[in-house]
């Protein structure tokens, strides 16, 4: 009897064991891994949700929706004015003309002089505080709310360009004798760094013509039209990409370096302002250089004088040790590689959130810091650098700026000041097309459905010494 009972129990447990194995869920087959775009969205929900709070659902929806464009009129095309009128008849307005207003020419000089006088005083004050850290420390103790470091100042010095660069200086770089040294970037250099800030006066290039539809208008621009020699009369550009070029504050005969120039939209915008005398377009990857060259061949006529302003270079902008262009440019644009948030949630090809690209994505802040360090070394004293990304991530935005400012000060003796973008933000917000999110440094354009631009982060730094 005991043998029968033991056999029955054994048979019973055997049935349960086989039943469990037979119907066990095959996770690998029934639940496939998430796509890179889905992983990116989960990542953004986790990190950006708390950062943006109630704004995040709107920003998230904007990221997942098609972005909107501006039409940049190509004034190098022979019949751009006729096509400009066509877009005007469709209801597209001239964005910069509406911001400038009718009375700008009369008011700009008076305001410029007033702001310049304040800026000269504030610049000397900042330099004095930097050279006398004990004084700065006492001031910080008595005025903890950044009364010194975030005080209103004014426009920086309007300084004329030092002249055109020779081909030799462009090819070989300037002042490379004692600057070639290896710098280790840890990502913590910016802890405790406070960057002086001053107000900045903006004026918008008269030669730039940018068309945009009003907020919430669902019309799309037609395909760009071409003149008789095949040069398009305009091209489409994300509205956020306009701001870094405006933030440069280009002046007549400036020399401009675009450190990560491909695909070339921002360099072309700078050329259309008719202000720079030389535009050096740099990119390290041959494929991107080819893309840049095709853009120039498409939008710049062969017989145009503008084509002579461009110089194409292939240098690794992230190599601090071998970089050899020092104090060579009046303005430097640094549109660095980033996580490209909008593309990350919409496409899987080349997505940095794929498993194989994890380390590349984690290394982005260090790469960006090195590029910005080289940019600050390349700009002349009194010149400006505009840093920009198309991500919402603070670790690729404000943190990179703080780290780079600390590195150039400690390792190269370069002192910088942040230029306030308040005027630019105010003007663009008043157009009804842009929405900004407050940041400790710079300005951040965030997507929103009625006029879906960005994301785009910009920060402007001026070199004092």
Swiss-Prot record:
Q: Return the annotated region ranges for Disordered.
A: 106-145
Q: Which domain of life is it from?
A: Eukaryota
S-S pairs: none
Under Gene3D superfamilies, the record lists: 6.20.240.40, Vaccinia Virus protein VP39
Check the record and name the InterPro entries matching this protein: MeTrfase_RsmB-F_NOP2_cat, MeTrfase_RsmB-F_NOP2_dom, RCMT, SAM-dependent_MTases_sf
Q: Where is the active site?
A: 390
List, in alphabetical order, the Gene Ontology terms for molecular function in this entry.
Answer: RNA binding; rRNA (cytosine-C5-)-methyltransferase activity; tRNA (cytidine-5-)-methyltransferase activity
The question of whether Thylakoid is a record keyword is answered with no
Instruction: Give the reactions, separated by semicolons, that this protein catalyses.
Output: a cytidine in rRNA + S-adenosyl-L-methionine = a 5-methylcytidine in rRNA + S-adenosyl-L-homocysteine + H(+); a cytidine in tRNA + S-adenosyl-L-methionine = a 5-methylcytidine in tRNA + S-adenosyl-L-homocysteine + H(+)
Query: What is the reported phenotype of gene knockout?
Result: RNAi-mediated knockdown does not result in fertility defects.
Q: Which PROSITE patterns match?
A: SAM_MT_RSMB_NOP
- Keyword RNA-binding listed: yes
What are the record's GO terms for cellular component? mitochondrion
Q: Which GO terms describe its biological process?
A: tRNA processing
The entry marks the following residues as binding S-adenosyl-L-methionine, namely 260-266, 283, 316, 335
Composition bias (Basic and acidic residues) maps to 106-130
Give the protein's biological function. Mitochondrial methyltransferase which methylates cytosine to 5-methylcytosine (m5C) in rRNAs and tRNAs at multiple sites. May play a role in the translation of leucine and proline codons.
Q: What is this protein called?
A: 5-cytosine rRNA methyltransferase nsun-4
